[in-house]
UniProtKB/Swiss-Prot annotation:
Record family assignment: Belongs to the DapB family.
Gene that produces this protein: dapB
Organism: Mycolicibacterium smegmatis (strain ATCC 700084 / mc(2)155) (Mycobacterium smegmatis)
UniProt xrefs under InterPro entries: DapB_C, DapB_N, DapB_N_CS, DHDPR_bac, NAD(P)-bd_dom_sf
Presence of keyword Lipoprotein: no
Name under which the protein is recorded: 4-hydroxy-tetrahydrodipicolinate reductase
GO cellular component: cytosol
Biological-process GO terms, alphabetical: diaminopimelate biosynthetic process; lysine biosynthetic process via diaminopimelate
Length: 245
């Protein structure tokens, strides 16, 4: 399988280039970065692209690869539901290409989201703290937003978080994502980390995941690359590729 990388000279992109080159069953076909022409992908007969670029350019990248029948595995951040709906419309109009967009490709992060969803209905309170390097473009992270959505779905019909706060500085209680408080930390020395804190009478539960370096994303990305040709249309998250039942 011929695999290209968009954002190939970035920190995550360079990690993906090395991973593809090291995989015996994959061929690195093209590395594309800012200033390069996307036609490099078609000229190199790329079959699947890995996109770790920037929210400002990822939609243009996806339009190009979908129009050219190239599958896409996307780890770029900043996907709103409006953007996801737009990508879904594009792939429906061009059924030859499949797209997988994931807020996080680290297997441990995906499992932590799954565990949080399972725990959500058993606790009165829940809050999320996500911690990343200071160069991250979006806040809260896509992983935190996805986690909050999964928790909110699991807590349907339950009372909201108890919170007697009546005065305070704007933002002190975090962002409200589907009724779940989410707190974002940006700090030099961090990579990608998340804590989900649950509380109820007499006990708390903390689910924490840490990506210590960017190679933590490699197994999930390569799994998606190898599976994407068997998927149809748009897939959000790598959960469908894992046996989480």
């Amino acid at each position: 399988m011929r695999v290209g990388v968009l954002g190939a000279r970035g920190k995550v992109g360079a990690t993906m280039v090395a991973a593809v080159e090291a995989a015996e069953d994959l061929t690195f076909s093209a590395g594309v970065d800012a200033g390069d022409d996307l036609s490099l992908l078609t000229e190199s007969k790329t079959e699947v692209v890995i996109d770790f670029t920037h929210p400002d350019v990822v939609m243009d990248n996806l339009k190009f690869v979908i129009d050219n029948g190239i599958h896409a595995v996307v780890g770029t951040t900043g996907f709103t539901w409006e953007r996801i709906e737009q990508v879904e419309a594009w792939v429906k109009a061009k059924p030859g290409a499949s797209v997988l967009i994931a807020p996080n490709f680290a297997i441990g992060a995906v499992l932590s989201m799954h565990f949080a969803k399972q725990a959500a209905k058993y606790f009165e309170s829940v809050e999320i703290i996500e911690l990343h390097h200071p160069h991250k473009a979006d806040a809260p992270s896509g992983t935190a937003a996805r986690t909050a959505k999964l928790i909110a779905e699991a807590r349907k019909g339950l009372p909201p978080n108890p919170d007697a706060t009546s005065t305070g500085l704007d933002g002190a209680r975090g962002a409200d994502v589907d009724g779940i408080p989410v707190h974002s930390v940006r700090l030099a020395g961090l990579v990608a980390h998340q804590e989900v804190l649950f509380g109820t009478q007499g006990e708390t539960l903390t689910i924490r995941h840490d990506s210590l370096d960017r190679t933590s994303f490699v197994p999930g990305v390569l799994l998606a690359v190898r599976k994407i040709s068997g998927l149809q249309g748009l897939t959000v998250g790598i959960e469908p590729l894992l046996d989480l039942s």
